[in-house]
């Protein structure tokens, strides 16, 4: 699962300096609802967090809401991944740096997850030159191309991404801080995620079209 989560202390870069709201109690309620297998209750709280974050201009909290909403939907929506993909795509369209980079990396992971779950059915699809908006019609090559393209787009504005220290974004991560020196910036983390995709032999495209 994608590890990037919510608040970041690097306000100059992440632009959330004016949001001093403590979301921790609400997130604890979300976690409790999910542990009790109450996805609808979790969704109600997520809606509350999203509304609050939107009012406060806290995009990272909204990203976290979408990540958790995917987890909540998984237990009762058969098409939860497709629904999440549509939701993330809408958010991606309006996002600005560096949130757009985060969304691209998230979207790449969602498309990859959808492909992995539906790979048998997808294996019978013919590669489309004019890719349809209906991902059920995509071929393996269409998915690999989309995923690879999004991982590359997540690395746009490399110089600026390298100015965001990962330690200053530690609340975004599910990770032990002692390992932050291995990936000192947001760019390093996003790059590592992309490398893991491209280095896997099963993701080798029949025709490379990313560059």
Regions found by a protein language model. Name each.
Residues 19-211:
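Extracytoplasmic/secretory-pathway proteins
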Residues 1-23:
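Bacterial Sec-dependent N-terminal signal peptides
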């Amino acid at each position: 699962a994608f590890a990037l989560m919510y608040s970041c202390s690097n306000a100059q870069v992440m632009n959330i300096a004016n949001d001093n709201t403590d979301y921790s109690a609400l997130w604890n309620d979300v976690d409790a609802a999910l542990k009790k297998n109450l996805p609808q209750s979790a969704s109600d709280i997520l809606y509350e967090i999203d509304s609050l974050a939107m009012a406060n201009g806290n995009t990272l909290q909204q990203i976290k809401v979408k990540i958790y909403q995917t987890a909540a939907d998984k237990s009762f929506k058969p098409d939860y991944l497709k629904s999440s993909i549509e939701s993330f795509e809408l958010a991606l369209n309006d996002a600005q740096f560096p949130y757009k980079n985060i969304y691209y990396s998230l979207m790449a992971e969602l498309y990859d997850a959808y492909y992995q779950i539906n790979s048998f059915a997808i294996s019978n699809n013919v590669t489309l030159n004019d890719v349809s908006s209906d991902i059920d019609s995509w071929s393996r090559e269409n998915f690999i191309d989309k995923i690879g393209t999004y991982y590359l787009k997540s690395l746009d504005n490399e110089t600026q991404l390298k100015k965001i220290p990962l330690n200053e974004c530690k609340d975004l991560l599910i990770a032990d801080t002692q390992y932050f020196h291995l990936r000192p910036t947001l760019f390093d983390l996003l790059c590592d995620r992309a490398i893991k995709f491209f280095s896997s032999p099963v993701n080798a495209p029949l025709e490379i079209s990313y560059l």
